Amino acid sequence: MSIFPVWAEINLRAIAHNIREIRRVTEPGAKVMAVVKANAYGHGAEEVSQTALAGGAEWLGVARVAEGVSLRQAGIEAPVLVLGYTTPEQAADVIRHNLSQTVYTRNAALFLAEAAAREGKRARVHFKVDTGMGRIGWLAGPGAVREILELARLPQLEVEGIFTHFAAADAADKRYTLEQFQKFIEMIDELQKNGLEFPLRHAANSAAIMELPGTHLDMVRAGIILYGLYPSDEVDRRRIDLRPAMSLKARVAHVKEVPAGFKVSYGCTYTTGRPGVIATLPLGYADGYSRLLSSKGEALIHGRRAPVVGRVCMDQVMVDVSGIPGVKAGDEAVLIGRQGGETISADEVAAKLGTINYEVTCMVSGRVPRVYIR
């Protein structure tokens, strides 16, 4: 058990297993990008990156320049693609730290080229095409082809790749995704007819890695499946064996017997119906255990489920342990993960919150220590 009152346990052996599975289902010849943005979906970017690279990933993906710089400062030398927006003021950091940058407007290409010229280097770029997601990217079409061809001639830019992102690959109906992919391929064909070649063409996200091998091209981008979670309930889970890497745990801080009619937590929204036992756990919404789990969430203590009672506080939450004999201060409580024969999954927590498993792991805040199992 950890020395901390609350901690997130990250099983790097699970990450290593998942990257092996991702490699197994990825088409031969396609590289694997491990997407480690948002502190590796809450799991710890440095440790996950090192584990993924050791397991066969060739690239890393981040959302922001600062995330890429942090990886470089940790001694990670693998190629890193900044998938999102970078300000003109940060362009020099892209060059200095040998990052690759997503480009999706003329202005972005120009300020990156200017920064590269000042540094006496070339900027590595991946052009982003919007084939139906509605986020960043040139809208696929003749106008985009003309502009990309023009910008690719800038001597300060080294064109490494071109990519798009699927909006609904995790749906059972793949028609929209295949339409997006067709637009992407048609645009690449037009660019190639005009003499522009791309070392790396990439489109496949986690769901497409699992179910659409024809979209794997030169590289795939593994996000949520790297962490052992499935993209949705509509994908075929039999295609890949995943192991969840994160558990959220705490130690029981206090246990007290309370009478019937006793009110618990802010707003007095919960009243005991009979005499019972309430345990306090030292985590709350400041740790990423959402207030929306008030009187909805559960914890595992002694391998049994204890319901959250009353409102989740900033730093504490109360659970009813009346039906669990012998609970005492210092006992382990599991908010996400397995204890004994019971499991509370990130998907279960997400369902109670009306959200997705991605958000559940990302919500675990920075003040929660990560404890790594190697």
Swiss-Prot record:
Instruction: Supply the EC number(s).
Output: 5.1.1.1
Instruction: List this protein's GO terms for biological process.
Output: D-alanine biosynthetic process; peptidoglycan biosynthetic process
Q: Which PROSITE patterns does this entry report, sorted A to Z?
A: ALANINE_RACEMASE
Q: Which InterPro entries match?
A: Ala_racemase, Ala_racemase/Decarboxylase_C, Ala_racemase_C, Ala_racemase_N, Ala_racemase_pyridoxalP-BS, PLP-binding_barrel
Q: In this chain, where does the modification N6-(pyridoxal phosphate)lysine occur?
A: 37
Q: A Pfam family this protein belongs to?
A: Ala_racemase_C
The metabolic or biological pathway listed in the UniProt record of this protein is: Amino-acid biosynthesis; D-alanine biosynthesis; D-alanine from L-alanine: step 1/1
Named cofactor requirement(s): pyridoxal 5'-phosphate
SMART domains in alphabetical order = Ala_racemase_C
Cite the binding residues for substrate. 135, 314
GO CC terms on record? cytosol
* Catalytic activity as recorded in UniProt: L-alanine = D-alanine
Write out the GO MF terms: alanine racemase activity; pyridoxal phosphate binding
Q: Which residues form the active site?
A: 37 (proton acceptor), 266 (proton acceptor)
List UniProt keywords, sorted A-Z. Answer: Isomerase, Pyridoxal phosphate
Per UniProt, the enzyme's principal EC class comes to isomerase
Using the record, list the residue span of the signal peptide; answer none if the entry has no such feature. Answer: none
What is the documented function of this protein? Catalyzes the interconversion of L-alanine and D-alanine. May also act on other amino acids.
NCBIfam families registered for this protein in UniProt: alr
Q: Which family does it belong to?
A: Belongs to the alanine racemase family.
- Per its record, how is this protein called by name? Alanine racemase
What high-level taxonomic lineage is stated for the organism? Bacteria, Bacillati, Bacillota, Clostridia, Eubacteriales
